[in-house]
Every structure is written in C-alpha cells, then in structure tokens.
Amino acid sequence: EGEYNILNTGFSDLTPFFTLAPWILIFLIPAVTMRSFSDEKKQGTLELLLTKPLSIWQIVNGKFLGALLLIVMAIIPTFIYVAVISNLGIPEGNIDMGSTIGSYFGLLFLIAAYSAIGIFTSTLSDNQIVAFIVAVFLCFFFYFGFEGIASVVPNIATLVAAFGMQDHFKSMSRGVLDTRDILYFTSITVVFLSFTVYNLKSFKS
C-alpha cells in the first residue's frame, strides 16, 4: 500500500516507480561510488594507480563505467514490473510503452550523472563517509534544488527549473527523447568526470 505501490494506481502505469527511483538512486549511487578514489587515497595506493601506463581519463572512465554497469544491472530486474503491469492491464498490454521506455532512458542518463558526481566527490577526501555525504547533497541539489528555487522565483521559474535534473527527467518520462535533455545529462556527466580528472592531476603533481 501507499503512493508508491505500482499495483495500486487503478490503471496500467509505472509512474510511482519512476517517481521513487531518483530518491533511491540519490543514496544508492553515492554508496557505490564513495570508495572509488577515497579508499585509494586512504590506503596510499592512489599514487601507485596513477603511475600505471594508463591515462587519468582511462582510469576515471574505468571507475565510472564500473559503477554505471553495477547500477544498471540493479535496475534490469525492474523490467518485471513492466511485464506485470502490462499483463494486469485491461485490456492486456494496455500500458504506455512510449512513456515507459522514455522513463528508462531517463533513468539511464540520471544514473550516469549521479555516478559522475559520486566519483568526483570520492576524490575530495580520503574519508568515504565524507565522499558519500557530499555526493548525496550534490545529487539531491541537482535533482530537487532547482525546482525548489524555481518555486520562489515564479517570474523565471521555467528558466531556473531547466538547470535541474528533475525537469529533464520528467521530460524524458513523457516518452519524448529531446536532444536538449540528452545534452543536459551528457554535459553534467562530462563536467563532473572532468572535475575528477582535474583533481587527480592536481594530486599527481
């Protein structure tokens, strides 16, 4: 029971799941990424890692792809929800597949952005708890913060909300893959991975 019960909406809909998922990921992804570099720094193995015949970008991308793959694998079992909702629909198969597919694409981009943020924060401290807390804060701010700011500046609310992840995730969840939304998430991901590389280069020098 409850507002996030996907079987309790009265129609074939996965909105409760896709509404809850960003909240779960805000805590799950930082928990996965917090040790990416903070543990290396704490154990004194980061210097050794940076001397390997790999570019810093390759090292960062390896950590990023590892985290991304792990979280995506955790999301795959939720496809069962799609099958269940589709089969329970009246008539059977009465589900908005466009919206569902768009929402999953939105989740993928959201996971990538959160992962990049989490990996970046893991370079800020050798304490993984600190890395976790900072990552949670940044993910929360980028997803909910701009919506909150927009609510108190109604004259430019649309402009302010466009800086937040929630606005773009909701857009993709409508089943429309707008290049602006894809570019937004890609930019956030690349920017935070670039910050990670910069921090590691500073540490190396």
Predicted features along the sequence, with ranges:
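Terminal transmembrane helical anchor/hairpin motif
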Residues: E1-S12, A131-N199, F203-K204
